């Protein structure tokens, strides 16, 4: 179960594959930065700490107290900025430019590769699955599902879903 991973979500697979790819290329940065509301930040913080890399996570004001505490507990420096994810993201990009930290977007291909492993396992375990309804969010989950489906030549129909109340970017 993904909820039994160290961060309680599939996102950790993305963070670990992202940092492993950098390590294999001899390109581990001194510091990374990202914007998130939670699980992506936990993934990046966990993987950064595992690789001895400083991590800053930018979250919007009013973000989940529990998610913020979890990211801090994993070693991330937390910066609260803006009223929504987009404002946090823009601030993270500006900080990356000022500090030289590597920006880690949640939809980076190296992250999606890790997320796809979850779908790879699931689709292999359920070959008769007809349809999977997948939250779109910022894209790593649904892109991982599609990548795994294509790699396995699985017939499942992937349907992206989003709340009618979700902010659009």
PLM regions and their residue ranges:
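PLP-dependent amino-acid enzyme catalytic core
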Residues: 1-169
């Amino acid at each position: 179960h993904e909820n039994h991973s160290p961060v309680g979500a599939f996102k950790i697979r993305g963070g670990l594959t992202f940092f492993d790819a950098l390590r294999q290329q001899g390109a581990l940065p001194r510091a990374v930065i990202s914007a998130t509301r939670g699980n992506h930040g936990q993934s990046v913080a966990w993987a950064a700490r595992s690789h001895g890399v400083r991590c800053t996570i930018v979250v919007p004001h009013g973000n989940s107290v529990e998610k913020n505490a979890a990211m801090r507990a994993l070693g991330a420096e937390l910066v609260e900025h803006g009223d929504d994810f987009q404002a946090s993201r823009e601030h993270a990009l500006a900080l990356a430019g000022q500090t030289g930290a590597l920006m880690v977007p949640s939809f980076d291909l190296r992250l999606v590769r890790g997320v796809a492993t979850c779908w790879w396992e699931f689709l292999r375990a359920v070959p008769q699955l007809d349809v999977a309804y997948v939250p779109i969010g910022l894209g790593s989950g649904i892109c991982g599902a599609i990548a795994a489906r294509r790699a396995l030549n699985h017939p499942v129909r992937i349907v992206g879903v989003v709340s009618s109340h979700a902010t659009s970017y």
